[in-house]
């Protein structure tokens, strides 16, 4: 673990040592802890200091040594030890051995221990001088940094030792405990005559022998020891406290010596005089160090030794270890949290105890100082300074300002769970949610109703009825948040200094989820806050920031309103925030640091001169940043500097990933609850049995006459039933909808046997909506009768209103869809709060994580996932049904999808692919397997960083989640329960596989418990994008060998379906020759299949054999049929390139598409007449078409339809027919518009149905490898050119206006025939530049025709990605000719916008989306127009008439007008 600091460094708070510049604008590593081999687990920042807590519970501080105003310091020392040891003199030399005393302690405390640590550590001891007389104990009552002197030597025969020296031998020092330098080294200095004289004569004169009884000695001893109970021991053994009150005598049993008790006052005087003389002597011999010795007298904290000679003596530029012996006897004494003010420190332990020390000028330490004791210490300090030189005394603070530095003392408050500090105030939050505050109250920042300082913890009475969950303080104000969701603010409330001394509520939640308007003030909504509970508060100089549990940060100045920092944070989800005076530091869930605010001293960690927010690159995954296995786990901010803690343990990384995952999941639930549920409930109606009965049982008879017979051109008795509610079988029971009226046949109807049912459909069910085109589209223009019903369009709004009344959605239905979502949200909030609390006080070595998952209340709450999985399918089906019958609800859901994209922090793309409603409803089912997988990873960590007990707990928790997962999987029957992670959901609530490796996908394909009914069809259609047919066949054979004993026949069914619906893999055809696919090797695949058939005796293989040879026989028959055909001189050859006519009389036959087939087919020049003949032949065999559709309905896999309608290049024979010539005087305008529309519709559908499904794969249309798509496109463009030519052929504007009206009428008839392609081709012709410029002609157009044109133009406009046309195409009912351009655009977007491989797995989601588009196309290809006829003459004219190109058209148009 590493520590990085940046910002203002001249005060030493960065801990980097002496730096050249005052600021450090980029993060720098604190190498001190690496050198001493210590791991930092917590950091905290104050105004001028930084605190580090290591994993062995040692405390380190760097920064300014003392408060310049009050002389206090955070580098506390208990009164220094005054121990002396035996001194021996000989005749020649005097060898003296002495421990640290008041004089030497200053230098000795700055020593480094064996680890190289700088320490400030001392403990008061009693001084015992043994001289055959009574003993004396000299204790220190001062808690300041002043070192009380002791006797450093005595007369030659006198032995000086500590009581512990007598009791036990010296204890070997621990590596982490600092040791003292030898006092012999300190005392062996150049001879000083003045000092030697004092040591020999002064002691003889001042010491007296006292003789008293044993009782008197014991009483004096007890009184002195009472003051020693709270003082720390400074012996080499740091774990032993002085407790010598039980000693009644210190007389050595082996020696008959009399202890001498020193008079306390005399001893202090002697000590002071000795020290002063020694200091003066040293100044004479070592003049280069007078300042250091002088400051030792002036109550300065001891200075650590520093290798840098230029270091400021008033600043610790590198961390100094502070003794924590005061915690040894406290229960649960592990440090939980540290907080700092200007010059005071607050420490919270796991046991809920609070310790403070430092400046207590305004009572911020939380306890009263003993005034008598303080005055006595100040008097002693003044006496010791009175004999100093004027130059030395002038540099010390005045006696009135002297204030002792308090040693750590426990505050009288218990069960504290959280602490916070301002500059000179402190707050503590107890386990019961009670808030206590103390310290300065100048601005009312204590919230006690006045501005009087408090020196002891005082409860905030205003919040006595609230359970406070978090608190934050600054120099002028404070803020808190309660469990009830209320936020309170108090203190200085504006820039003028107005004071709010009582906590006042702030309606924070009214701002957290509100809409943020655009900056231009136009009232257009920009984005929405994500809402949620507040997790953390941070206060700066007149600023407040809040972090929600959703990971969103809001900040505002006082006074002001909360504003989300989404743009500043670049949509990062935030886990932790801290604030300095004028800057905010955010730690994201992904482990990156984002800083916002002022950057004057480099506190943002970036070299940018501007104050723009951004990521700190050195602490991110940038190439110039951290290593790949490192991440930031904790942050802290001081007044003008910042600190980041970096870790690389796998356990921590997995734990943070769990937090990130659960926060993202909570945002998903939040979107479901606050957007979808609330929006849908706003339009729902209370449950009404009467209305619901009418809605479910409604029929055409309940509709008003204005909505009966909606299709233009049909008589009133037409049997066009509008499907309502849940009438799922309505389209099966009706008669044939094709009716003859005035010689015209309308194409809205279709034989009931030809309709595609929901149960057999593989495409999106939205195509089969019961409202369909006959409902929504006809309600828009249904009253248009050809060209003459345009004025009835005004009834549309009335019809729509009635329609909505009969499609009411009840509140119970909405509640059924979102059942248990609210309970899941509360459970996730609780679980996430546990994780956040654990991670905020995290230590991967000592902390346990598994107990959270085994919490009984939490595990009991997780049972909610079982009923949710049970009702998931029902919820999805309810949603599907109400969307079918209520168009308004569908629009609301679309609006919710748009709002979801800008609601709160953006969802993590690693866990979320789609944010539509059905995907969000699936997210709870995917949450449990994610937790299970992560627990397994945590339990298998063998790095040695995890507590063994925690591993056992985690593995046990994983077992429980596995049982829960298997129970949930009973509703879906996945091969492996975690497969649901790679699934998406369709409208029916069936999870669908989204990705996996090829073996995994093949296992899913052949598993007997497959839960995705469309998986096989999607796979067989698209597998060529990620593997070859031969490779797939090998995998299937291998799987078959493994599953032989199961006798489930799954592999055989897959191969059989492959042969039946994709036989082109086993034989060559013209399309494969045209595309020249290198992976297409039908000969090798056929050999493998035949070998497999003949080598296996399994009975189920006969099914494959039957289908395979049946298809081969059909191909041979088609070859013989082609070879037997004789061409005559009167026959006109051939159709366009690769346009092969579907032979309806032999619809079960297939062409042999080997290379030999090309030699047997006569090829000549293409003519348009051949196309006309082919289409005419298609329409002269309606009975055969109906038979084909009957076969389609009998096939459960409609999308492939035995290749009769979709594989025209492979399943057809060439049919050459004589084409009648076009009459010489034929005029298209003489034909009825409906007749032209019918003919055009049949032609458009033919070209559309000719397109092979393989042409839609791999963007072949953009590579000139899709001939049928090109033919259909050319036909579309030719139709537009025919419209342009016919209009420009008119002689004057009046005729041109009439021609315009004629084609508008044809377009309307095409629209009512569901021919969207024909409608678009005509409208695009009318919108061409050469036609639009004919202003005179357009001005003479009748008003009704102009209204109709504008209406159709809005439908087929490409604006907003063909939004109107797409809406019709998703609700229309076959037969239909859709607009091909929208499908090609969708396929291009899917191909280019989705990678084929994600994380080493095949992105099957991409293949599924491609297949969905193709299945929609196939549905419209399969259902033909069997109830209308085409006119051969019109057909020939549309195919072969002369047309103008663009240049000719523009020239003629310019000449006309």
Curated annotation (Swiss-Prot):
Gene Ontology MF annotations: guanyl-nucleotide exchange factor activity
PROSITE patterns: DH_2 (PS50010), RASGEF (PS00720), RASGEF_CAT (PS50009), RASGEF_NTER (PS50212), RCC1_2 (PS00626), RCC1_3 (PS50012)
Matching PANTHER family: GUANINE NUCLEOTIDE EXCHANGE FACTOR, RAS GUANINE NUCLEOTIDE EXCHANGE FACTOR C
Boundaries of every N-terminal Ras-GEF domain copy: 989-1109
Bias kind Low complexity: ranges: 83-121, 134-158, 283-292, 376-403, 703-715, 739-762, 1142-1210
Span of the signal peptide: none
Name of protein: Ras guanine nucleotide exchange factor C
Segments of this protein annotated with the region Disordered: 75-196, 209-264, 282-313, 376-404, 703-762, 1127-1210
Ras-GEF domain ranges (all copies): 1232-1454
Domain DH: 650-971
GO CC, any one term: plasma membrane
Coiled-coil residues: 1138-1211
InterPro entries: DBL_dom_sf, DH_dom, Ras-like_GEF, Ras-like_Gua-exchang_fac_N, Ras_G-nucl-exch_fac_CS, Ras_GEF_dom_sf, RASGEF_cat_dom, RASGEF_cat_dom_sf
Classification via SUPFAM superfamilies: DBL homology domain (DH-domain), Ras GEF, RCC1/BLIP-II
Acidic residues: compositionally biased ranges: 225-237
Residue stretches of each RCC1 repeat: 1-55, 351-401, 432-483, 485-549, 590-647
């Amino acid at each position: 673990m590493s520590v990085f600091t940046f910002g203002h460094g001249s005060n030493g708070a960065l801990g980097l040592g002496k730096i050249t510049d005052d600021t450090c604008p980029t993060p720098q590593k604190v190498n001190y802890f690496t050198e001493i081999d210590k791991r930092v687990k917590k950091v905290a920042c104050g105004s001028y200091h930084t605190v580090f807590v290591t994993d062995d519970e040692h405390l380190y501080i760097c920064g300014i040594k003392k408060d310049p105003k009050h002389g206090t310091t955070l580098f506390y020392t208990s009164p220094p030890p005054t121990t002396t040891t035996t001194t021996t003199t000989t005749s020649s030399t005097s060898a003296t051995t002495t421990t640290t005393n008041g004089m030497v302690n200053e230098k000795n405390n700055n020593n480094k221990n064996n680890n190289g640590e700088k320490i400030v550590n001392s403990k008061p001891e009693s001084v015992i001088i043994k001289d055959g007389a009574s003993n004396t104990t000299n204790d220190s009552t001062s808690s300041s940094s002043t070192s009380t002197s002791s006797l450093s030597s005595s007369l030659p025969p006198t032995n000086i030792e500590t009581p512990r020296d007598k009791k036990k031998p010296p204890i070997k020092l621990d590596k982490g405990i600092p040791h003292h330098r030898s006092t012999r080294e300190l005392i062996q200095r150049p001879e000083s005559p003045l000092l030697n004289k004092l040591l020999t004569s002064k002691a003889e004169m001042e010491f007296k022998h006292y003789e008293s009884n044993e009782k008197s000695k014991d009483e004096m001893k007890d009184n002195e020891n009472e003051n020693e109970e709270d003082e720390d021991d400074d012996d080499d053994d740091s774990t032993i406290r002085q407790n010598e009150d039980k000693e009644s005598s210190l007389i050595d049993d082996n020696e008959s010596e009399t202890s001498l008790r020193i008079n306390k006052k005399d001893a202090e005087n002697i000590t002071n005089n000795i020290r002063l003389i020694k200091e003066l002597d040293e100044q004479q011999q070592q003049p280069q160090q007078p300042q250091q010795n002088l400051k030792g007298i002036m109550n300065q904290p001891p200075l650590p030794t520093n290798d840098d000679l230029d270091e400021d003596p008033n600043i610790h530029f590198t961390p100094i270890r502070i003794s924590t012996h005061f915690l040894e006897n406290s229960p649960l004494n592990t440090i939980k949290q540290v907080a700092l003010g200007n010059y005071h420190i607050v420490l919270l332990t796991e046991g809920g105890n609070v310790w403070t020390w430092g400046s207590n000028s305004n009572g911020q330490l939380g306890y009263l100082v003993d005034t008598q004791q303080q005055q006595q210490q100040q008097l002693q300090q003044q006496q010791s300074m009175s004999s100093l030189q004027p130059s030395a005394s002038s540099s010390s603070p005045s006696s009135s300002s002297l204030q002792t530095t308090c040693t750590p003392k426990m505050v009288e408050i218990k069960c504290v769970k959280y602490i916070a500090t301002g500059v000179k105030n402190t707050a503590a939050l107890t386990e019961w949610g009670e808030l206590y505050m103390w310290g300065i109250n100048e601005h009312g920042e204590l919230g006690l109703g006045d501005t009087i300082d408090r020196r002891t913890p005082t409860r905030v009475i205003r919040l006595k009825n609230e359970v406070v969950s978090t608190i934050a303080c600054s120099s002028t104000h404070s803020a808190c948040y309660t469990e009830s969701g209320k936020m309170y603010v108090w203190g200085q409330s504006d820039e003028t200094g107005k004071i709010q001394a009582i906590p006042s509520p702030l309606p924070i939640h009214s701002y957290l989820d509100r809409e943020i308007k655009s900056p231009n003030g136009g009232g257009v909504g920009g984005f929405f806050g994500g809402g949620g509970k507040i997790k953390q508060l941070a206060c700066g100089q007149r600023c407040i920031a809040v972090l929600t549990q959703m990971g969103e940060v809001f900040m505002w100045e006082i006074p002001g309103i909360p504003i989300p920092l989404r743009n500043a944070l670049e949509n990062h989800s935030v886990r932790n925030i801290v604030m300095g005076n004028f800057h905010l530091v955010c730690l994201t869930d992904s482990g990156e640091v984002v800083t916002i605010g002022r950057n004057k001293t480099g506190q943002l960690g970036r070299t940018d001169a501007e104050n723009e927010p951004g990521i700190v690159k050195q602490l991110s995954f940038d190439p110039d940043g951290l290593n790949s296995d490192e991440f930031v786990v904790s942050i802290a901010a001081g007044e003008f500097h910042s600190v980041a803690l970096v870790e690389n343990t796998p356990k921590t990384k997995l734990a943070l990933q769990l937090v990130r995952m659960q926060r993202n999941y909570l945002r998903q639930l939040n979107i479901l609850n606050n957007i979808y549920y609330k929006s849908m409930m706003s339009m729902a109606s209370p449950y009404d049995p009467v209305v619901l009965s009418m809605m479910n049982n409604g029929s055409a008879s309940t509709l008003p006459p204005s909505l009966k017979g909606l299709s233009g051109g049909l008589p009133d008795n037409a049997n066009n039933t509008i499907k309502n509610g849940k009438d799922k079988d309505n389209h099966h029971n009706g008669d044939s909808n094709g009716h003859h009226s005035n010689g015209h046949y309308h194409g809205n109807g279709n034989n009931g046997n030809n309709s595609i049912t929901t149960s057999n459909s593989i495409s999106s069910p939205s195509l089969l909506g019961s409202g369909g085109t006959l409902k929504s589209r006809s309600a828009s223009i249904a009253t248009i009768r050809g060209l003459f019903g345009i004025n009835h369009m005004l009834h549309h709004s009335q019809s729509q209103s009635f329609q909505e009344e009969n499609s009411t959605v009840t509140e119970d239905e909405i509640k059924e869809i979102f059942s248990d979502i609210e309970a899941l949200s509360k459970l996730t909030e609780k679980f996430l709060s546990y994780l956040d609390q654990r991670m905020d006080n995290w230590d991967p070595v000592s902390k346990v994580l598994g107990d959270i998952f085994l919490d009984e209340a939490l595990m009991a709450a997780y049972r909610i996932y079982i009923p949710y999985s049970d009702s998931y399918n029902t919820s999805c089906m309810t949603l599907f049904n109400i969307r079918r019958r209520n168009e308004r609800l569908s629009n609301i859901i679309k609006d919710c999808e748009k709002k979801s994209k800008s609601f709160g922090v953006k969802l993590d793309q690693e866990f979320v692919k789609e944010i539509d409603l059905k995907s969000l409803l699936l997210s709870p089912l995917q949450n449990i397997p994610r937790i299970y997988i992560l627990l397994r990873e945590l339990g298998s960590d063998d790095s040695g960083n995890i507590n063994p007990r925690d591993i056992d707990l985690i593995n046990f928790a994983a077992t429980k989640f596995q049982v829960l997962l298997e129970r949930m999987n009973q509703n879906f029957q996945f091969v492996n329960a975690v497969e649901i992670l790679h699934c998406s959901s369709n409208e029916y609530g069936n999870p669908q596989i989204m990705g996996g490796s090829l073996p995994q996908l093949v296992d899913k394909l052949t598993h007997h418990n497959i839960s995705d009914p469309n998986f096989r069809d999607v796979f067989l259609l698209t597998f060529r994008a990620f593997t070859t047919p031969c490779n797939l066949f090998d995998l299937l054979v291998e799987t078959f060998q493994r599953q032989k004993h199961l006798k489930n026949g799954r592999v055989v069914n897959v191969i059989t379906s492959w042969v039946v619906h994709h036989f082109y893999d086993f034989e060559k055809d013209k399309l494969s020759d045209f595309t020249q696919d290198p992976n297409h090797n039908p000969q090798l695949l056929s050999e493998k299949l035949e070998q497999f058939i003949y080598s296996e005796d399994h009975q189920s293989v006969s099914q494959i054999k039957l289908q395979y040879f049946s298809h081969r026989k059909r191909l041979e028959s088609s070859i013989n049929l082609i070879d037997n055909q004789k061409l005559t001189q009167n026959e006109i050859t051939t159709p366009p390139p690769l346009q092969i006519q579907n032979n309806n009389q032999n619809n079960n036959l297939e062409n042999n598409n080997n290379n030999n087939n090309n030699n047997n087919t006569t090829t000549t020049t293409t003519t348009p007449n051949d196309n006309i003949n082919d289409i005419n032949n298609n329409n002269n065999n309606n009975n055969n078409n109906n038979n084909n559709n009957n076969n389609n309905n009998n096939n459960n896999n409609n999308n492939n339809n035995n290749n009769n309608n979709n594989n025209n290049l492979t399943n057809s024979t060439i049919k050459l027919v004589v084409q009648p010539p076009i009459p010489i005087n034929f005029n298209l305008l003489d034909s009825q518009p409906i007749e032209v529309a019918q003919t055009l519709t049949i032609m458009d559908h033919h070209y559309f149905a000719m397109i092979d499904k393989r042409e839609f794969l791999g963007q072949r249309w953009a590579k000139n490898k899709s001939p049928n798509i090109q033919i259909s496109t050319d036909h579309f463009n030719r139709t537009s050119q025919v419209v342009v030519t016919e209009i420009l052929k008119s002689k004057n504007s009046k005729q041109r206006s009439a021609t315009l009206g004629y084609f508008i009428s044809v377009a309307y008839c095409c629209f009512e025939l569901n021919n969207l392609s024909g409608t678009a081709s005509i409208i695009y012709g009318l919108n061409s530049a050469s036609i639009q410029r004919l202003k005179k002609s357009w001005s003479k157009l009748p008003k009704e025709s102009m209204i109709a044109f504008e209406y159709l133009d809005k439908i087929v406009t490409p604006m907003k990605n063909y939004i109107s046309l797409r809406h019709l195409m998703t609700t229309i009912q076959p037969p239909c000719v859709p607009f091909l351009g929208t499908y090609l655009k969708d396929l291009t977007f899917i191909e280019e916008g989705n990678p084929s491989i994600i994380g080493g797995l095949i992105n099957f989601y991409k293949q599924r989306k491609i297949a969905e588009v193709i299945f929609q196309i196939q549905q419209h290809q399969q259902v033909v127009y069997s109830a209308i006829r085409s006119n051969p003459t019109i057909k020939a004219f549309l195919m072969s008439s002369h047309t103008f190109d663009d240049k000719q058209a523009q020239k003629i148009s310019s000449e006309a007008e």
